[in-house]
């Protein structure tokens, strides 16, 4: 009995003199991106721990390519939280009195770059203690898109797809029919790890509203899908319409090309004709040359007339400037009257008359 009491007393003294100790166990924490992670670090002090209290948090990045980074420090009754730029303004002590034995921190607005091992170090000479916490940041499923891949017609095969825009693996998929019996057809065998349901030989009873829920360890999201299985459409009419439309389009294009070509040919012909006319037409004569030609022709006519025939004509004034009448273009001569045959003249009562012949100088022969 006495030996037992001595053993218990020694154990109590050893525990009392153990000094500084961190009571928080090492652990792993999983949080979603954008949330706040609480990293605990609680400690106790011994009576011999009389030195200044120093608290330091370190981060060992997950890629193991960077050295340990100091993210927050308490020393000399002051807090320093601007050591690590990636966490600046996002890491804080949870307690206002760190000497009470709580060195826990909060990391807000978590990012994927925050993944790593966090180490809490507490020192109060001669006592020293440290603990490690593994932090994992996951992305919740979000931006889920549900759609049908294929033709929703009776007898056809198609697929129902459920695709998240983002989300950390592993992901699990759960399909459910909201209308009617709220059960999937027995022929469908969706896998929890596959985002696709293959539908074979679709029937009208497959129509309805479906929901797809995507989950991982930190959250979930879902989308709705409306499925309408309809009778097959008249494909022959559709194909015929497409062919006719294509032919009409080709005819229209050919007509436009023909009209454009014809218009270009007409414009080219007009330009060539206009150019030929301008080359063939001689330049117009001046008014002075016209007048001179007219005067010369008059002189020739007068010279050929006999003196007896010139009595009715006045003498030409050669010392005067030609009048405006001479400058005018000569008029075309009038045609002589049609000749009548002699027998016709006798029938008409004409009397034959003898006209004496004249020589070139005007004398009667």
From Swiss-Prot:
Region described as Disordered: spans on this chain: 269-343
Any GO CC annotation of this UniProt entry: apicolateral plasma membrane
SUPFAM superfamilies per the UniProt record, alphabetical: Immunoglobulin
Database matches in Pfam families: Ig_3, V-set
Topology of this chain in the membrane: Single-pass type I membrane protein
Cytoplasmic-side positions: 260-365
Location of the Ig-like C2-type domain: 20-136, 141-228
Record's protein name: Coxsackievirus and adenovirus receptor homolog
The gene coding this protein: CXADR
